[in-house]
Design a protein with these regions (language model features):
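Short, compositionally stereotyped local motifs that mark structural "simplifiers"
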Residues: 1-217, 223-225, 230-235, 239-244
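Conserved ATP-binding subdomain of kinase catalytic cores across diverse folds
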Residues: 168, 202-308
Length: 308
């Protein structure tokens, strides 16, 4: 069962679970699409800290002590961060390898104005004993949905559904670190390439797609923690239907070496709720008794590759 999908990715700093049950932070506005910039109010019984770069406010050195409303504005002019990562690190669209030139990616990172942007606010509160609440995360788009997604009206009309847009917030290193990053070729690829090249002076670029890499690893060891905000969007606006911490892995076979990769999301008690509780496919997906299935342990975000 397929649905059209839009994906936004925001990476954060290193994360460890140091949170306990205390007064969580309440946001004055739910994540979504807003026509104009606004002032966001946060409330809690504890002292609130927040971040705007996707990092965990209970750990990050970029966290800000909340002392008044936060301006949420259009970020279309901001510089790229995740999208600025060199494609050479995570895909194999290379020119042929030679010892003189090495591996050179034929695709450049996109320009700043080519990447749609949103604002991710993460907040946590600390009580008088120094205990942190769970982190609350919300994602905001400023402008109309048509400003952010070209052709959304025609796309929704053609599919007969709203566009499912998922914002993913996770640790930057869990994506791009050479040792543990799941999105990159990484150390696994570098070691495999050394063995494959041996004494060769030249190899075909396509051969590198078949080499082992970080992104081709599987199993729980290569699952990372993430947060998702799931929106149903059309030309008239957006509705947030899921706001949840979960596990994330790379999805696919040969397509794992593509520029854009698929993801598989896992609901587990380790992260919070053990199910994604939403009828993602509406009435199209029913159980044997004819009831709409509205709880899932996992689902896949396809990237459109041949094995995605």
């Amino acid at each position: 069962f397929l649905r059209p999908l839009g994906l936004r990715l925001c990476s954060n700093g290193n994360k460890q679970d140091t949170h306990t049950d205390t007064s969580e932070v309440v946001f004055s506005r739910q994540g979504g699409v807003y026509d104009e910039e606004f002032e966001l109010e946060l409330t809690s019984k504890g002292i609130i800290y927040y971040t705007t770069d996707g990092s965990d406010p209970s750990e990050s050195d970029t966290s800000i002590k909340y002392d008044g409303e936060i301006k949420v504005a259009d970020r279309s002019g901001d510089a790229n961060i995740v999208s600025a990562v060199s494609p050479t690190l995570f895909c194999t669209n290379f020119s042929d390898y030679s010892k003189d030139a090495g591996l050179v990616c034929r695709i450049d990172a996109p320009s700043d104005d080519a990447v749609d942007k949103c604002t991710v606010i993460r907040a946590a509160a600390k009580d008088s004993a120094g205990n942190w609440s769970a982190v609350t995360t919300q994602t905001y788009f400023i402008g109309n949905t048509t400003d952010h997604i070209d052709g959304i009206e025609a796309g929704c009309k053609a599919s007969g559904n709203d566009l499912a847009v998922i914002s993913i917030t996770m640790d930057y290193d869990d994506l791009f670190d050479s040792g543990k990053g799941i999105y990159v070729k990484g150390d696994v690829f570098d070691n495999a390439l050394k063995k494959f090249i041996g004494n060769k002076n030249w190899i075909k670029a396509d051969d590198t797609r078949k080499l082992d890499a970080n992104y081709s690893q599987r199993g729980r060891e290569w699952e990372r923690e993430a947060h998702i905000d799931f929106f149903e969007m059309n030309e008239n606006g957006a509705k947030q239907v899921l706001n949840q911490d979960c596990g994330i892995r790379i999805q696919g076979n040969y397509s794992r070496s593509d520029l854009q990769k698929g993801f598989r999301l896992y609901a587990r008690k380790d992260y919070g709720d053990n199910k994604f509780r939403y009828d993602i496919w509406g009435d199209e997906l029913k159980d044997k008794d004819g009831n709409t299935i509205d709880k899932f342990k996992t689902f896949v975000l396809r990237a459109g590759g041949n094995c995605a």
